[in-house]
């Protein structure tokens, strides 16, 4: 019989007590269910199944908070119940589109405000206040044809143009064979007197494209023929029309880089600007190509009227003369003179 001391018995007793206390904490027990071992990945959750009607507690962990879609079958009942209606989807889409439109509108307003601020700051703040110079802001293109301004009327005599054009028209009519045969020479109207102009109009035509814009100047007491809108002690402004000279713009760009047009080419073409008046002097004060055009009407009798058109630059230059006459209750036009026919 083996002798066991009290010390060994005491050690065995303590070891048994300690192991019985520690092992339940450190060792995981494996439970058996249905004859199969439980998957250790789903100790704290239930494994997924292929049953579409299973509860949420038995679903796949990847779709715990969202409905799953079965492969090869229609969407689950929960998924169908959670689908948004067409009206709700349309409302969401409209809200997103409205938000985008508001954002785009804010961006456009910001860019436009920055552009206007920069233009006004340079035009008024720098050129008018600092440099004390005149500045011009173009707004929109305008027609090349315009009425004579008050300043133009002081430099051009409309009565003189009317009288000279009347003489030139009578000269042309007296040389025409149709007028000589049907009305005779010297030409007389129904009252037996020399025909006179009954209606006459004058206007300007710029050769260069024109724009309408705002002119700014420092506010001063200097007299001017123009009507100004004023902000006292700040600046004054008015609306005006100005031509855009492409050749002058090119000259300015070349001068900025210390190159002149004479270094590149030299073209002399007075016919382009002054036509047949290349040996005449232009009107003083004009810094761009400007034509003064006129249209006149002269009656020969109750059924016959002469209409003529031309340009004025120191002298009158006729472009066209038409005769309008009523024949068999119809208005017939005869072209008596046309400038292109003589070239």
From Swiss-Prot:
Keywords: Membrane, Mitochondrion, Transit peptide, Transmembrane, Transmembrane helix. The keyword Transmembrane helix applies. The chain crosses the membrane at residues 108-130. It is found in: Mitochondrion membrane. Residues 67-84 have a biased composition (Polar residues). Residues 54-63 have a biased composition (Basic and acidic residues). Belongs to the AIM39 family. This is Altered inheritance of mitochondria protein 39, mitochondrial. It comes from Candida glabrata (strain ATCC 2001 / BCRC 20586 / JCM 3761 / NBRC 0622 / NRRL Y-65 / CBS 138). The gene is AIM39.
